[in-house]
Amino acid sequence: MVTKLLASRGATIQELNTIRKALSLLKGGGLAQSAYPAQVLSLILSDVIGDPLDIIASGPTVASSHSIQECFQILTTYNLLSDMPESVHTVLSGSPVEQATQKDFSHVHNVVIGSNRLALEEAKRQAEDMGYFSVLLSDTVCGEVSTIARLYCLLIQLTCLSATAGNDLLKDKVEGELSSLVAKLALPGLHLRDILRASQVEKPICLLAGGETTVQLRGNGKGGRNQELALRVALELHRARATADGRFLEKYEIVFLSGGTDGQDGPTEAAGACCSQELVGEAEREGFNVEEFLNNNDSYTFFVRFQSGHHLLMTGLTGTNVMDLHIVLIRAKGRD
């Protein structure tokens, strides 16, 4: 109940795990302490941005770096303090959890064997083998899906504009908005120079990024963050293309994909979805109102009904989770 309430308000995975650690005997280093003095080897699959060992799986073999006061602050931020069960208040009202010293965990060896970065690096190799000029943008993408959709729309526009003669004023405008948004999102390691360099090659382009977005629930539809992100990117591209300045996009084939590496996006059977810049126009001609589906957080229903689910990413459960992968493919029309 606690994590569902937090997730519905847009809490990050870091915030969710901070609360989980405070409410568990095994999380936050509890498992390692229970095993002491036996040697402990922990093989870790990271599903958290930045791979912080004390946050992944709520850190059962890592000393906790958070206090009870931080838990109260998180619950207050999302206006959930009064909605918590009495049992939660009882636990959190206890004495602050003292941070264990490093020597308490000298018997523990933690090794990250899988992460979003590793998945992206392998995807990059695969794309290059398929003939794409690939750029790994970031493995720390996070934020509300509508903002991230705007980010990807601007990245796509800048990539295409950089490969198109003229349009210098529009390119400067797009690059300026993109730079401001990147700074606002505080995405470390996302360098626009890599995109500009990619635009100068003759190969089709593959932009790769990963992380974990959040969805602000406003409706009662069915969907997941990856499907909603794909649908919002499609809408952003549709709007950009509909303007007089956006006609340059018609010269390119563009595909965006967002998928969860665990094979399940929200309470759906899909891992995510893909879209093109033509998707919204095609949907409108078939009688679908994309904005209505988005306003109801009903992206899965849209993708199931639209073209018989052709745009859904169906992998089945993978048995692992290293967050989400975002892939953009750009190819100039008429170029093999």
Label every model-predicted segment.
Residues 1-55, 60-63, 298, 305-309, ...:
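Glycine-rich, mobile lid/loop segments that gate access to catalytic sites or pores
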Residues 234-336:
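Internal helix-turn-beta structural module
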Residues 12-20, 80-99, 129-143, 161-185, ...:
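Flexible, glycine/charged-enriched surface loops at secondary-structure junctions
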Residues 35-41, 57, 62-166, 185-190:
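Accessory alpha-helical/coil subdomains and C-terminal extensions
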Residues 145-154, 182-198, 215-229, 266-275:
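Short glycine/threonine-rich loop-to-helix capping motif typified by GTGT followed
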Residues 1-13, 112-113, 125-137, 216, ...:
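Alpha/propeptide regions of enzymes that mature by internal proteolysis
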Residues 1-19, 53-55, 60-88, 258-270:
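Glycine-rich phosphate-binding loop plus the immediately following alpha-helix
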Residues 1-10, 64-79, 218-256:
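Gly/Ser/Thr-rich active-site loops/lids in small-molecule metabolic enzymes
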